[in-house]
Amino acid sequence: MADEQQTLDQQTPEQPTGAAEDLTARVQELEEQLAAAQDQALRMVADLQNVRRRAEQDVEKAHKFALEKFAGDLLAVVDTLERGLEMSDPNDEAIKPMREGMELTLKMFDDTLRRYQVEALNPEGEPFNPEQHQAMAMQESASAEPGSVLKVFQKGYLLNGRLLRPAMVVVSKAPAETPPSIDEQA
């Protein structure tokens, strides 16, 4: 009987050890699954925040630039009014009331465009900027810095800081060196 008791005593500690190892392994496995689930949940929350942020940015851009096509179409009207004022004689008494009406209409257009963040680009005298200007011609000039805008054919416009239409300009270049004449060489 003592032998049996000793055998049972030897087996009893092994069984709990085996069961404890199984439980420890199971706890570790469950902890790993929990950590993976928490990580996945954090990633999903981050993805959801990113989607929400992108959607808010898209809505903001849509609000900012919804007027882009409409504003672009109005620029032709502004250009026509400006050309009409340039072509008409301010001293001609017969058209003076019409000129005043055109000036007031143009001022109203300019004020309205500014209210909706449409900003005119009139770069005369400024350095040429290919991101905002379109060079229509180059002209030699001794008085202007090479690479600067000499004349503006058509003003450009920005809508909320983004280019709506480039300014069409004439860009200065350095005068060509004239070869010395025969008289100067002699």
Swiss-Prot record:
Stored Gene3D superfamilies: 3.90.20.20, Head domain of nucleotide exchange factor GrpE
A GO term for molecular function: protein homodimerization activity
Stored SUPFAM superfamilies: Coiled-coil domain of nucleotide exchange factor GrpE, Head domain of nucleotide exchange factor GrpE
Domain of life the protein comes from: Bacteria
Composition bias type Polar residues, residue spans: 1-15
HAMAP family per record: GrpE
Phylogenetic classification of the source organism: Bacteria, Pseudomonadati, Pseudomonadota, Gammaproteobacteria, Pseudomonadales
Keyword terms, alphabetized: Chaperone, Cytoplasm, Stress response
Region (Disordered): 1-20
Subcellular location, record wording: Cytoplasm
GO BP: protein folding
Quaternary assembly: Homodimer.
InterPro entries: GrpE, GrpE_coiled_coil, GrpE_head
PANTHER family: GRPE PROTEIN, GRPE PROTEIN HOMOLOG, MITOCHONDRIAL
Cited function: Participates actively in the response to hyperosmotic and heat shock by preventing the aggregation of stress-denatured proteins, in association with DnaK and GrpE. It is the nucleotide exchange factor for DnaK and may function as a thermosensor. Unfolded proteins bind initially to DnaJ; upon interaction with the DnaJ-bound protein, DnaK hydrolyzes its bound ATP, resulting in the formation of a stable complex. GrpE releases ADP from DnaK; ATP binding to DnaK triggers the release of the substrate protein, thus completing the reaction cycle.
Pfam families documented for this protein: GrpE
This protein's GO CC annotations: cytosol
Family: Belongs to the GrpE family.
Name of the molecule in the record: Protein GrpE
Annotated NCBIfam families: PRK14139.1, PRK14140.1, PRK14150.1, PRK14151.1
